[in-house]
Amino acid sequence: AEREVYRVPEEWIGYGTWVANSDCTKLVGIEIARRDWTPLNDWKIFHDFFHKGPHCRLLRVDLKTGESTTIHEEKIWLGHPIYRPFDDNTVAFCHEGPHDLVDARMWLVNEDGSNVRKVKAHAEGESCTHEFWVPDGSALVYVSYLKGQQGRTISRFNPDTGVNEAVMNMPACSHLMSNVDGTMLVGDGSGTPVDVKDTGGYTIDNDPYLYAFDVAKKAYFRIARHDTSWATVANSRQVTHPHPSFTPDEKAVLYSSDKDGKPALYIAKLPEQPEMLHA
């Protein structure tokens, strides 16, 4: 039977993805004040919304009682809240907006709202994007790229030591995800990023492939072509983005594409004898 656990209050708008903890007993999410809200139907509006400095709050919701508690609140566009797996006290979130304009994208906060801390200070011309927790909770992995460069870097942050490190170079993938322990990653080849202000400075060639990355070997291989258009469809900016992830047995990859005309889900099996490449 279905039941309503929580309803966003009238004066707020629920934004982005809301993510459960490992036990699926609670969620973290972002709400934006309705008075500041603009429907983000395309990337031009996305850029303009950043400069508005909307009133946002990061909250948690108890999935049993529906009780909500504000963890963090400020007049900065917040997004991408994610519990650290198996550690409910640690929540990651981001400062949303064009990656070359945000002060620092990735942040952590304790679940009680204390100890707000920056994951990484951006280097000159550096953009960081699509951070995610390795499913075992061991690291926060993200994509880093520099203005004027075609390639990108897979990096990771250890929340226990506070150390950032570059893992390996890679082709220009937009979204990464890992297997359970972070030894294998999967990414989607992309083109010039739309979520930066200076698109001219970040122009790159389009890449239509899905890639798997072997972290120990610092090498990668092509899985299949995704051939998505990256287009905004029906006012949804990310419905055509591949966002690949491994199947539970790690033998195939699930992804989205509109290569056949409409956005759809596909599964591509990993090759049995892949050709290993180096960036």
Where are these regions (language model features)?
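Blade-terminus and WD-like Trp-Asp/Gly-His loop motifs, strongest in beta-propeller folds
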Residues: 17-27, 81-91, 131-141, 176-185, ...
